[in-house]
């Protein structure tokens, strides 16, 4: 019975890893399409926010993508608001209305997305502790807990399963 439970757990881990791998591939496709489009997305007025809020969120997203400031451990909504020449309340509202997340949730989602990509690279042997600090987490424990909450498994297990999946794919080809 214990062996069967262990096998089921491993099968679920593999399923999660496959889903994450598919998401990474879809993200790459979307990024390619976005970079090929004329200026990215167009602004429209939505029921959730106005054009100014969407424009502010777009600037915020651009800052995240181009400068990867989410990697800074001392990042705050106040610092970003100053950088974007707005106030913290308006920035927080723009983030919440356009992403459905709070500032800290958005920052952590950027960090976890990058961690997912790095840990998916089979030739990357960065230590989890070093990765946690590189991505702006205060401690490796916070990183691991956030990663597990988001992805469903610890970063070490995710890396191991990604490598296993990669090796299985190579063996079948």
What are these regions (language model features)?
Residues 1-7:
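Selective detector of the "anchor" transmembrane alpha-helix that sits immediately C-terminal
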Residues 8-109, 113-122, 146, 156, ...:
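Membrane-proximal linker segments that couple transmembrane helices to downstream signaling/catalytic modules
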Residues 122-158:
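Sequence-specific DNA-binding recognition helix
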């Amino acid at each position: 019975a214990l062996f069967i439970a262990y096998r089921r757990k491993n099968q679920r881990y593999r399923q999660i890893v496959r889903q994450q791998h598919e998401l990474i591939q879809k993200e790459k496709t979307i990024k390619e399409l976005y970079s090929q489009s004329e200026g990215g997305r167009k602004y429209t007025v939505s029921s959730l926010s106005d054009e100014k809020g969407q424009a502010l969120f777009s600037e915020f997203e651009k800052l995240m993508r181009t400068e990867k400031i989410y990697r800074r451990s001392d990042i705050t909504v106040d610092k970003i608001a100053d950088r974007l020449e707005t106030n913290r309340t308006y920035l927080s509202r723009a983030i919440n209305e356009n992403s459905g997340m709070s500032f800290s949730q958005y920052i952590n989602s950027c960090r976890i997305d990058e961690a997912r990509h790095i840990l998916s690279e089979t030739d990357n042997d960065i230590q989890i502790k070093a990765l946690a600090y590189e991505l702006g987490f205060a401690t490796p424990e916070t990183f691991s807990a956030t990663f597990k909450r988001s992805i469903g498994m610890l970063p070490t297990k995710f890396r191991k399963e990604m490598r296993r999946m990669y090796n299985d794919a190579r063996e079948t080809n």
